[in-house]
Amino acid sequence: MTTSHSDFTLVIGQKNYSSWSMRAWLMLKFLNVRFDEVTVPLYGPESRRSVRALGGETGLVPVLIDRGTPIWDTLAIFEHLYENYPAVWPADQKERARARSYSGEIHSAFHALRGAMPFNTRARRRLSARTAEVTADIERVLAIWGACRGSPWLFGAFSAADVMFAPIATRFRTYDVRLEGPAKDYMNRLLEYPAVAEWLKLGEQETDVIPTLEIGAERGRESHAQPVET
């Protein structure tokens, strides 16, 4: 819990395992918004019920509670924050449209990458083999990074687009996806961003273990049969 007197409460899963919680948390940190933090352990028998009791109607994390009003789903949270914090998205209208499109793509696609490379910031392993689908997802990520010519971030200033890609950068680190040139530089900038580094440090301090996210590709795909975050 970051403060005892704030307008916002963020409901999240464990930092080591919840990529969508990471995105909402990073956004609030980037905006320098004070918030209380409630962690609901993922994949527990009462997980969804606990989230619903806190206002998240889907039972999925993250949920942002703004002065009593719950907002669930990461992109909905971003859009809600944008109403009062325009730094969420790029200032230029055309770039804002691209940033929203790329962020929506992350939200709706990259299923092969997520299935074969479960989010686990503590782990270090290499994939024994990459399927064509996983390779295509990785190549698409790199294509997006290459298409954005902003410096040092995708659209110049740090924005929601960078937040959305931060958990993918951690997956590349976990599974030793080796990059070169500007893509490697951008990944390292994401991993070194202060709020990202803080999240990773806090995740390393957690003691919870979710076996389906510790074993690898086969069990990882199984673990996504019943989503716990969005």
Task: Name each region found by the language model.
Residues M1-T131:
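GST-like domain detector, emphasizing the conserved glutathione-binding G-site
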Residues F8-V11, R171-F172, G216, V228-E229:
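A short, structure-level motif marking secondary-structure boundaries and short turns
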